Amino acid sequence: MRYAIIVEKGETSYGAYVPDLPGCVAVGKSKSEVLKLIRETIEFHLEGIKQEGSKIPLPSSSTEYVEV
């Protein structure tokens, strides 16, 4: 599955979250680090959902850019 992620640059770090998986977040010192961490976090999050016996949410979010 391919989930959309949002990456935000802070003053000293990068943060990432997955709109389709509430609570699935990661923080890293660089963009490459946060991308690695969010991938691991998604895998861990999905495993937890499976273990609970819950249904895994299908990816439904998408991203677009708007020029202003």
Task: Label every PLM stretch briefly.
Residues Y17, L35-K36:
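Short, surface-exposed helix/turn micro-motifs that flank interaction/cofactor sites
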Residues D20-G23, L58-S60:
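Hydrophobic residues in alpha-helical membrane-spanning segments
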